[in-house]
Amino acid sequence: MSALPSLRVPTLPVAFEAAARAAGDRIALEYGSSSITYRELDAAANRFARRLLREGVTPGSRVGLHMTRCLELYIAMIGLLKAGAVVVPLNPSHPVTVRRSVVREADLPLTLRDVPAGLSSVTVERDVHELLAAGADLDDTSPGLCTDPESTAFILFTSGSTGRPRGVRIAHRGIARVASYNGEVEVRPDDCFLQLAPYSFAASTTDIWLSLLHGARVVVLPSQLPSLPKLAHTIKEYGVTFLNLPGGLMNLLIDAHPEAFAKVRTVIVSGDFPSAPHLARVMKAVPGTVYNAFGCTENSALTAVHPMTPEDLQLGVVPIGLPLPGVGLHVLGEDMTPCAPGEVGEMHISGAGLAQGYLGLPEETAAKFPTVDGVRMLRTGDWARTTPAGEVVLVGRTDQMVKIRGFRVELREVELAADQSGLVEKAVVRAVDATDGQKELVLFCTTATGEAPSIEALLADLKSRLPDYMLPARVHHLAELPVNVNGKLDRMALREPRAVLVEPDGTAQQQPVVRDIIATTVTRLLAVVTGREPIGVSDSFLASGANSLQVIQLAASLHDVMGVDVRPEDIFQLDNAESLAGHIRALRQGHREVPA
């Protein structure tokens, strides 16, 4: 097995500076009615980098980035990289316990923020806007400190089997390699990208860096959980031509607003895969090309692409395609030798995109990144086979990692979080097919007393520990967990009983008499969205198993049926039909406030 030809890759600041010189006064970023050109963005990032150096940041310093979506986020991110710092993104929408865990694991001496302080006592928090103002008069030329493509650019935290997030160290070369890419997926300077993915996830590298390093325009969505009308309006209003969407959200968008795709030239389906009927409609609506894409954090995101055809849909098998330049895909058997076409083995990745490893986890790094015949590789944990044309088709997972709404989730991390709640004795999580064709998590548990736990209390505890995409849709209490003939847990024997919500004493919940017509309508719409029985007006949406995509769908249904525009994040915050009904009344009276 031979190594790939060497790919000359610069650092991210060097690649961005080249793109900025070529783009000049073209718009780089748009956010609402505000915009910034490439020339302005580069100069602002240079001034910010120099301010950071005066604050004591040195090449190799790890700095947290704890910000909401705004133009200043990108100035800060690029400025940090120009100062030679390692960027550690913190998602403000994640539970504070998750963010504090990242601060602790990454050992962050400094965190830049535009959100309220008080994240953690182990990091110094500085306001980004104050630092920008303090550096406004500094030299706006590049400090030229970041020149080694092998140096660490980002540490991105992913789901881990140990029950705590693990940091993936990503080198500049891993992301900057896309600067020289213009192959199967063509990026034009007149393209307009939509920045949808959270910047703390590897999927955002396509939205941010594939665009900026080619001089394209990036439209930043104010929310990572947009309503469907808002998403469609943004695509049309700003003339978005390049869309990178998870499959579940694509399903909802083509159902509700097929016209949004009318002028989109390129669509990349990433994360989870859309249903074949939805995909066929997207392919018909898009005047350009729809691609199936594969990527993972350990290979700095975008890895392989495949232009989808009607024949793919007829066969029911869509390859992830061929690797990007500088990337190798290898399907290997147990003896670590290449499998013949059609033979199933584990997919491995080699090349310029490989991460440096896991932060502080040398043994896990060695196991995940083996050297095979002198070539460093990544074991993806995906069963795969190659086609006669050399493309790779995924056929399953080798471990307990699953994809939920486009995010990779270790089932063990969810189980450990439930065990730590103190409400269950033992928890086991399975991924099952949902009514919308996506995957969802179901938690099975036992208790020391044999009595069912409070489902709402358990889910509330999990919500404080885990991101929303890792929350189980349903919880089932069992007298005991099934075991096989060897006395080991038999996951496949776990079956869902008929869905009945239970109180802590094990009795079925009694639904209150509903007299609020708006709340009643909300529960009925939620039942349609989730494919389950209507819940009570005071029951938690979270406890009923509603996920972020279903909340977006509920917001769209409320718009269609009741003529009100409810933000998905407000639905998450209010969390029951009774409170949401009050909010809807306030909206109808012209008030935007979310009731406490």
Swiss-Prot record:
Residues 512-588 form the Carrier domain. PROSITE patterns: AMP_BINDING, CARRIER, PHOSPHOPANTETHEINE. InterPro entries: AA_adenyl_dom, ACP-like_sf, AMP-bd_C_sf, AMP-binding_CS, AMP-dep_synth/lig_dom, ANL_N_sf, PP-bd_ACP, Ppantetheine_attach_site. Pathway: Antibiotic biosynthesis. The keyword Ribosomal protein does not apply. The modification O-(pantetheine 4'-phosphoryl)serine is found at residue 548. Its EC number is 2.7.7.97. Disruption phenotype: Inactivation of the gene abolishes sibiromycin production. One of its GO terms (molecular function) is adenylyltransferase activity. 4'-phosphopantetheine is transferred from CoA to a specific serine of the apo-form of this carrier protein. GO terms for cellular component: cytoplasm. It catalyses: 3-hydroxy-4-methylanthranilate + ATP + H(+) = 3-hydroxy-4-methylanthranilyl-5'-AMP + diphosphate. GO terms for biological process: amino acid activation for nonribosomal peptide biosynthetic process; antibiotic biosynthetic process; secondary metabolite biosynthetic process. Keywords: Antibiotic biosynthesis, ATP-binding, Nucleotide-binding, Phosphopantetheine, Phosphoprotein, Transferase. Belongs to the ATP-dependent AMP-binding enzyme family. This is 3-hydroxy-4-methylanthranilate adenylyltransferase. It comes from Streptosporangium sibiricum. The lineage of its organism: Bacteria, Bacillati, Actinomycetota, Actinomycetes, Streptosporangiales.
